[in-house]
A protein has these predicted regions:
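Alpha-helical transmembrane segments and immediately membrane-proximal extracytoplasmic
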Residues: 1-488
């Protein structure tokens, strides 16, 4: 039943859009600053376009940070889940479940804290939960319910989406998250309400935390090609399978979280294992930004001229391929030796050499066709490590999201397929293939093609012409994953 449109109703919708948009934007901006603060204190660096991951942080500090972070969070979550009112999921909040105020605040802060310490899990659930909780209080204050609670559900869902839009400066993705995943109902009213609130939240959040390019895809070809359209179908099919498996895995991990005191040892153990893995694969840490950028930064100079792709010096310096081996100015804030030494030694072992030569750009990881199988190996290692460590973190009892881990898996899988693809079709770039993979695997794992496509395109600020191949891949992956997930 559609609600009746009245001046009074449009008035409170407009008021909710502005008031909640501003409040959620402030919250999203502050949560981002909190993340930066935790990273600075525990890891000695702050993520950004110039440094997408803790590559310049000594291996021992990586391991200690994530172990301590998950240990502290495990204790607090145990007390919260057994001594206070539990915090429901956003979907349950939309359905009417009450979100306790202080418990939700603590729950949200803990999620940001563990991501900042290096835990392999997404941070996007925190601003969504904050938005949903604020929306419930707004509805209580102004007695907003509607017929059978339809207005209240809409406000809570749209506010949760605005949290996503605010924290990532992605208003389209925030709107589609609300109408495609939470409400599963697309109307002009919901789209307008959702887009308005997400846009305001994004604007306010950017005013607090600043605007920074989240994913650097400057090594991508300038235009789409017919062969890239064909790649989109192939990559979409592969990512449909991968996304379905990741969705099943994350659902299994969520369903088997410890319910008692086991969280007190499982979360510290997950932190220790993450830290040990990060000594060799530092890009596994955090919400997935570093792992995803590894795929986006895979640049093969031999085919670049044919594809029309170019990589600037600043982009190459910030490339994980360079940072993994200590090339360039990795970090001014992370003191001590061992920057990237784990992966550098691993690469030297594969080559049978003595590791990177120092500050020469990409010294240990020469990005060329002659080393394509080595590059595939590192991408495959990143893909497997990120998937397993993320599922382990969820299984141990941690709360958080899987959007950014899904993008990371899609980017690395797309880059792997792209490395093989450009041998046959050098007019395409690996970065474009990684972009297609990121959107299509996220779509498959979330069963939300519009949200996934918009989130990846907004985070990367990709040229609008790439909506066509990305859309084709997303459609393919969504259909295949839907079929796989429907099978018993």
């Amino acid at each position: 039943m559609q609600p009746t449109v009245t001046i009074k109703r449009l008035g409170w919708l407009a008021a909710a859009t502005i008031v909640l948009g501003v409040l959620i934007g402030v919250g999203a901006g502050l949560l981002t600053l909190l993340l930066y603060g935790v990273e600075h204190v525990l890891l000695g660096y702050i993520e950004g376009p110039e440094l997408p991951g803790p590559f310049g942080v000594p291996a021992a500090r990586r391991a200690i940070s994530v172990t301590v972070g998950l240990s502290i969070a495990g204790i607090i979550w145990y007390l919260m889940r057994h001594k206070t009112t539990a915090v429901p999921s956003v979907k349950k909040a939309v359905a009417g479940k009450r979100m306790p105020f202080w418990q939700t605040i603590a729950h949200v802060v803990l999620q940001i804290f563990i991501v900042g310490s290096g835990a392999s899990i997404g941070r996007e659930v925190a601003p969504r939960e904050l938005g949903a909780m604020l929306a419930q209080r707004f509805c209580d204050l102004f007695h907003i319910e509607g017929v059978d609670g339809i207005d209240r559900r809409m406000v809570v869902a749209v506010a949760a989406g605005a949290g996503l839009g605010g924290v990532y400066d992605a208003p389209l993705a925030g709107m589609f998250f609300a109408v495609e995943i939470l409400l599963v109902d697309v109307t002009i009213e919901k789209v307008a309400f959702g887009l308005g609130m997400s846009a305001i939240a994004a604007f306010v959040a950017v005013a607090i935390k600043g605007h920074h390019l989240f994913y650097d895809i400057t090594a991508m070809q300038p235009e789409s090609t017919p062969t890239l359209m064909l790649f989109a179908l192939i990559c979409g099919a592969a990512c449909g399978v991968g996304g379905a498996l990741f969705r099943k895995g994350s659902q299994w991990a969520e369903a088997h979280k410890p319910t008692g005191k086991a969280i007190l040892w499982q979360m510290p153990l997950a932190g220790l294992i993450t830290g040990l893995v990060a000594t060799v694969v530092p890009q596994v840490m955090g919400n997935g930004r570093a792992a995803a950028q590894l795929g986006f930064s895979t640049f093969i100079p031999e085919t670049a001229g044919t594809a029309g792709a170019m990589q600037s010096a600043s982009s190459a310096a910030a490339s994980p391929w360079n940072l993994l081996t200590g090339g360039g100015n990795v970090s001014d804030s992370a003191s001590g030796g061992g920057a990237g030494s784990g992966m550098a030694s691993f690469w030297a072992m594969l080559q049978g050499g003595n590791g990177p030569s120092g500050s020469v750009m990409n010294a240990g990881f020469p990005l060329s066709q002659s080393n394509i199988w080595m590059l595939l190996g590192v991408l495959a290692l990143t893909f497997v490590a990120k998937a397993l460590v993320t599922l382990m973190t969820i299984r141990s009892g941690a709360s958080g999201g899987v959007l950014q881990p899904g993008i990371a898996l899609g980017s690395t899988l797309g880059a792997m397929l792209g490395l093989v693809w450009i041998l046959m079709f050098p007019t395409d770039s690996v970065t474009a293939c990684a972009l297609i993979g990121a959107a299509s695997l996220l779509s498959a794992s979330q069963q939300a093609p519009l949200m996934a496509m918009c989130l990846v395109m907004e985070l990367s600020e990709a040229p609008i012409t790439f909506f066509v191949p990305v859309g084709m891949a997303v459609a393919t992956s969504s259909l295949i994953s839907k079929w796989l997930l429907s099978r018993k």
